[in-house]
């Protein structure tokens, strides 16, 4: 009984928890990273790609509209 729960917890972490944290990390650091950190970010995206793909329909990464004052 413990083995299926362990598999479920690991699958949930791999497909949901870590990709959500990774998306927040990428959104905060994308424009201010060094080249070494960017390589690490690419590695994390490659490693957690299935989870990012699962979450992609629910994420809006488009820039916010600008406020133009007249």
From Swiss-Prot:
Give the Pfam families listed for this entry: NdhL (PF10716)
Its placement in the membrane is given as: Multi-pass membrane protein
What family is it from? Belongs to the complex I NdhL subunit family.
Keywords from UniProt, A to Z, are: Membrane, NAD, NADP, Plastoquinone, Quinone, Thylakoid, Translocase, Transmembrane, Transmembrane helix, Transport
For this entry, the protein name equals NAD(P)H-quinone oxidoreductase subunit L
Q: What is the protein's quaternary organization?
A: NDH-1 can be composed of about 15 different subunits; different subcomplexes with different compositions have been identified which probably have different functions.
Q: Which GO terms describe its cellular component?
A: plasma membrane-derived thylakoid membrane
Name where it's found.
Cellular thylakoid membrane
- Which PANTHER family does the UniProt record give? NAD(P)H-QUINONE OXIDOREDUCTASE SUBUNIT L, CHLOROPLASTIC
List GO molecular-function terms, semicolon-separated. Answer: oxidoreductase activity, acting on NAD(P)H, quinone or similar compound as acceptor; quinone binding
Give the stretches traversing the membrane: 2-22, 39-59
Q: Which reaction does it catalyse?
A: a plastoquinone + NADH + (n+1) H(+)(in) = a plastoquinol + NAD(+) + n H(+)(out); a plastoquinone + NADPH + (n+1) H(+)(in) = a plastoquinol + NADP(+) + n H(+)(out)
- What is the protein's known function? NDH-1 shuttles electrons from an unknown electron donor, via FMN and iron-sulfur (Fe-S) centers, to quinones in the respiratory and/or the photosynthetic chain. The immediate electron acceptor for the enzyme in this species is believed to be plastoquinone. Couples the redox reaction to proton translocation, and thus conserves the redox energy in a proton gradient. Cyanobacterial NDH-1 also plays a role in inorganic carbon-concentration.
Q: What is the lineage of its organism?
A: Bacteria, Bacillati, Cyanobacteriota, Cyanophyceae, Nostocales
Gene for this chain = ndhL
Listed EC numbers: 7.1.1.-
Enzyme category, top tier: translocase
Coiled coil (UniProt feature)? none
